[in-house]
A protein has these predicted regions:
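Core subunits and conserved enzymes of cellular information-processing
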Residues: 105, 130, 138-142, 147-148, ...
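Gly/Ser/Thr-rich helix-start
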Residues: 37-38, 70-72, 81-84, 109, ...
Length: 307
């Protein structure tokens, strides 16, 4: 669909729903890589009802949709995104205690705010996630993890909008949580809220562990440069960063993209990188590691648009 048509349809829908939107918006402002072309329109739903209405309007008018959270695990084409970007973020971020050990939150809440809420309520179980840059929905979608913990340990239920635009939920084993994967990775459903079961603990102990993990992140990861976190999934029996370093790729650059000199498992935007630079470097690293080690690395990063 032509950009003007897309913008006009989605804009009218957003205005009826009193939802924020941005026209011809640069995706570099909405991704942690700080790259990518423009989107025809970005709309910010603030409820399940508004999200469903936007999706319904786009479907009826054959408008392609892209669902994003904090944009911390995506690489957007330099050509931009033709269609509607639906950002589930701070407008979609209510949080509350369901009981003394259970948090229920909307999927757009940042992991930082979720972890802070757990700390405020002396709830342990999310210490591993302190410093993860994405949203709670994004973390559930990929079963995010670090430092011996993962969402699988605390996530007990997700509410979603399915491909027929009906509201439903998955619980327990239905969530299909495994390494960097969930049932939502493949089913096309959109997570709208999460239920997490945690444990009461000493607030100071929780805080100490959170900041210990944050310190490890700062020491070992190139947080001073734009990136999407760990670029590759850990291959069974190996560590991606070690394989890349053994292939002498630490510091290797294509355009403004570089394999981090601090941690080879991170591809970073060293300065003025394009998405094409980053995608080309990711491919080069994958092929080089495969040629030298016989292991094909699987990207954690999702690619949106045409590459």
């Amino acid at each position: 669909m032509k950009g003007d048509y897309v913008t006009d349809i989605v804009k009218k829908t957003a205005e009826k729903l009193n939802c924020r939107y941005l026209e011809n918006a640069s995706m570099r402002d909405f991704t942690s890589f700080k790259t990518g072309g423009n989107a025809d329109i970005i709309v910010f739903p603030d409820s399940i009802a508004s999200l469903t209405a936007i999706l319904k309007s786009c479907r009826e008018n054959e408008i392609k949709t892209y669902i994003i959270g904090n944009g911390s695990n995506i690489l957007v084409s330099d050509n931009g995104l033709f269609g509607a970007v639906i950002k589930i973020g701070s407008d979609f971020s209510n949080i509350e205690l369901a009981d003394e050990n259970t948090i229920v939150c909307e999927s757009g809440i940042s992991m930082a705010k979720l972890c802070s809420f757990a700390l405020e309520n002396s709830l342990s179980g999310l210490e591993f996630a302190f410093g993860i840059p994405g949203t709670a929905g994004g973390a559930a979608f990929m079963n995010a993890g670090a430092y011996g913990g993962e969402m699988k340990d605390v996530l007990v239920e997700c509410t979603h909008i399915d491909t027929d635009l009906n509201v439903g939920k998955l619980t327990g084993d239905e969530l299909g949580l495994s390494y960097r994967k969930s049932a939502y990775s493949d089913n096309g459903y959109i997570i709208t809220s999460l239920k997490l079961r945690l444990e009461k603990s000493d607030k100071e102990s929780i805080k100490a562990k959170m900041y210990e993990n944050l310190g490890k992140r700062k020491d070992k990861q190139p947080l001073e440069f734009p990136s999407a976190g760990s670029t590759f999934k850990r291959p069974e029996g190996y560590f991606a960063g070690a394989l890349i370093e053994e292939c002498a790729l630490k510091g290797y650059s294509i355009g403004g993209a570089q394999v981090s000199e601090k941690h080879a498992g991170f591809v970073i935007n060293k300065g003025n990188a394009t998405s094409t630079d980053i995608a080309t470097l990711i491919d080069y690293v994958r092929n080089t590691v495969y040629d030298n080690k016989g292991v094909m690395l699987d990207p954690e990063v999702r690619f949106l648009g045409e590459f």
